[in-house]
Amino acid sequence: MSRIGNKVIIIPAGVEIINNDNVVTVKGPKGELTREFNKNIEIKVEGNEMTLVRPDDSKEMKTIHGTTRANLNNMVVGVSEGFKKELEMKGVGYRAQLQGSKLVLSVGKSHQDEVEAPEGITFTVANPTSISVEGINKEVVGQTAAYIRSLRSPEPYKGKGIRYVGEYVRLKEGKTGK
């Protein structure tokens, strides 16, 4: 992990970073993110570059170093470009539609599933079988997309369900009769 931690984070134009005793606020064109980091990792901002320095080479510090760097980089990318996860639905009668900020899913149950958009997350439904989840916080985008997928994850015999775009679902062979 320490090799990741040693990489320099390039700060794009229009992104401002405020470090107040390891509580880092990143402001950009898409929004603002704030997060508290480990006090042992020193965060230095010089011009358009950000570096992280760890106090020693213990295994714990190396892992925290790499994780902190990855989280900071995700914050910078999130406020400048944003994150997007796309899902697709396969199955007869499987549909998605937007009702305000709610996502209403018909996925073969006796009732419809409603997913409320968390703060900072927007849903887009291009057609009834494709959903995109967008936001500036990579963790929340991923968790929301994973929750939507978990409502009807792809089954292994016909592949029906909600999956990520490009996800490969290995299909099993059915029972062979006598």
Curated annotation (Swiss-Prot):
GO terms for biological process: cytoplasmic translation. The keyword DNA repair does not apply. One of its GO terms (molecular function) is structural constituent of ribosome. GO terms for cellular component: cytosolic large ribosomal subunit. SUPFAM superfamilies: Ribosomal protein L6. The keyword Ribosomal protein applies. Keywords: Ribonucleoprotein, Ribosomal protein, RNA-binding, rRNA-binding. Signal peptide: none annotated. PROSITE patterns: RIBOSOMAL_L6_1. Pfam families: Ribosomal_L6. InterPro entries: Ribosomal_uL6-like, Ribosomal_uL6-like_a/b-dom_sf, Ribosomal_uL6_a/b-dom, Ribosomal_uL6_bac-type, Ribosomal_uL6_CS. Coiled coil: none annotated. This protein binds to the 23S rRNA, and is important in its secondary structure. It is located near the subunit interface in the base of the L7/L12 stalk, and near the tRNA binding site of the peptidyltransferase center. Part of the 50S ribosomal subunit. HAMAP family: Ribosomal_uL6_B. Belongs to the universal ribosomal protein uL6 family. This is Large ribosomal subunit protein uL6.
